[in-house]
Amino acid sequence: RWLEPVPTLPNVERDARGNSNLRLSLDKTGLHVFVINFDGICSLADEIRLSFPQLGVSGGVDFAERLLNIYSPAPLGARFADGKTSFSLFAPRAAYASVEWTLDGVRRETSASSCDGAIWTASADGDLSGARYFWRIGGKNRDATTAFSSSEPVADPYANAMLSPDGPSIVKFDADLPRARPFKPPHWHDLAVMEIHLRDVLAKARADISDGERLTFEGLTKWLADENCYLRKVGVNCVELQPVQEFTAAKRTDYEWGYMPVNWFSPASSYATDPENSSQNEDFARLVEAFHRAGIAVILDVVYNHVGEPNYLVRADKEYYFELNMAGDLMNFSGCGNDFRSESPMARRMILDSLKKLVKNYGVDGFRFDLAELVGLETLREIEREMKTLKHDIILIAEPWSFRGHIAAALRDTGFASWNDGFREFMLSYALGRGDFAGFKYFVGGSRDTSRFCAQTVNYLESHDDKCLLD
């Protein structure tokens, strides 16, 4: 869009095509700083370029500061009201967007519009529950900070259910999700936690469950009801489930740890008994309830420091959702290909909204945050405030490091516990005869240099990443 200057200004000049330009002369001001104001609101999808021929300089205006501070409380995802199904998506620099949806074998496309230039909304008559849908997002890729591609289907980041990691999203309204029953987890200082992978614990479980059920939430629910289930006998009062939010998987039956999330609102379709009908929501809720009936609290291992493939958020806005270097390339302190920009207001909102849903709709008792150093202290503190308002006895645990740094000491004055890698390394040395009693006393006494109280340190010898007595 060409910004037409006021024609009566003394420094207006016209180019060969008759376009009006404002000539800014260093000879007039003696300064190398110019302040340029214009009326109205410029969309972030617009391009504004400044040219200084005398200096041989030209370039686009950088809106990064404005971009990275955009926030909207508007509803996102699919919702039903007043006889219409509406779809809303945050894409602040998109030039156009549409929703492709299919119901009862009939495919349609609905164009979206944006009132504020950030939230795009498309509506269709009727209740579209069960419809499959994708977004199409388009815009001009002026530099490496965007990755728009209208040919690439984009699953809804706020979809409550996915048919598979590759999509499509499934229309499932919040009103149709389960509602959790109250459960009081053990106090932090009484926690005995076992980390488990759903398919690992079911692979050799002695229970009357089929091979297919051994891959699902439902299979673990059935095993928990069996009197021979060792999870009920081993002495733990809490399990930490490795990731169960929708994650990258080539095939539904593939064994994956789950640390490459593609959607934080949909329980994993790979673990559903009937993903075609989005059973994962009810399947997962029943599993949490089964653990609670057995007196066992449920912590989820959650990954908010990076995303997997397909990377849908990079199509919505690469710079808004991801940390970039000066060349516009994705940063990679996670070691997983990208670092999620959690301090962007709508990115942080997405984290909080998904955590709240896991507590309110599924009854989850706590969270272990993968590579929490990348999530950032400010976001972690906001998570603590919001989660403890929602559930005062929520369990919050950080893996307090990344390839960038370590924040265990910085978490000392928060309500987070931290995985203690110092204890892990010391116990290996101790077992090999290289440790001493003073060191043992320090770690068993709560590692008070980084912890305010003993229960704030999570001492462990083995995890999915660390078999330190063998490594």
Q: What residues fall within each predicted segment?
A:
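Immunoglobulin-like IPT/TIG beta-sandwich domains and homologous Ig-like subdomains
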Residues: 1-43, 101-104
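The feature marks proteins involved in alpha-glucan
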Residues: 26-84, 107-109, 114-195, 201-212, ...
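Short proline/glycine-enriched turn/loop motifs at strand-loop junctions of beta-rich domains
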Residues: 90-96
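Short beta-strand elements bearing conserved aromatic residues within extracellular beta-rich modules
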Residues: 97-99, 133
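Conserved alpha/beta catalytic core and glycan-binding cleft of carbohydrate-active enzymes
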Residues: 159-170, 384-471
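Substrate-binding/active-site clefts of carbohydrate-active enzymes
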Residues: 184-188, 197-362, 372, 379-387, ...
